[in-house]
Amino acid sequence: DSPEKLKAYLSETNTKILGIYTGANYIYTDAFEDEFFRIKKTIENMEKFGIKHLVLGGGAIRANGNVEEDYKILAKNLDRVAQFAKEKGIIASYHPHLGSAVETPEQIDQLFSLTNISFCPDIAHLVAGGGDALELIKKYRQRIEYVHLKDLKGSEFVPLGEGNIPLEEIIRYLKEDGFSGDWLVEIDGYSGDSYYACEASYKFLEQFFKK
């Protein structure tokens, strides 16, 4: 409601907003027109703040499961959003997510065979969805502009380096392959201390990134 206040706060704290995440009802055609209006407003506000990445998640799961036509509609509507974002100088990437129409490796392949949208791999969501995160990243490397780094232990998201995901191998692969995009660290619903999670994740990353 107060963009100037937010801009002032970001300036005072030397903080930058790297990306915005949004989901939508992509497969329900009538509902999507309202959703697209909302997303366009979000993109226009992002442009004012110089925010680089729009992360798109979701895609509803029907009560009886999704059908092939749903993925075609999802792909078409993602392309509409990506094109509008591109016109505003913003990179739109799709983020496979638990509890959505695209969470398994097979669903990721199905969607990406229908659209050229960029890929935002959330490492822990890829693994929790039954995938090999490194193999999916290698497979769709040319689509990747933005990475969500997250660790997983059992069914809980944990600070980087405390889970069972081979993050070191993934980070080294991307760096050695010349990845020059952006990285974001996040932990969904962590039950521990937030400050500790940030500190532990930062220390983990120090071995890969120079200050």
What residue spans do the PLM features occupy?
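Aromatic- and glycine-enriched glycan-recognition loops and surfaces
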Residues: 1-4, 34, 166
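Hydrophobic faces of well-ordered beta-strands that scaffold small-molecule active sites
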Residues: 17-22, 54-56, 92-94, 119-122, ...
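Active-site beta-loop-alpha junctions enriched in small/polar residues
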Residues: 22-27, 59-61, 97-99, 122-126, ...
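Active-site acidic/histidine proton-transfer and metal-coordination neighborhood
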Residues: 12, 26-119, 128, 195
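Histidine-acidic metal/acid-base catalytic patches
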Residues: 11, 87, 105-109, 113-120, ...
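Aromatic-lined substrate-binding rim segments of carbohydrate-active enzymes
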Residues: 2-14
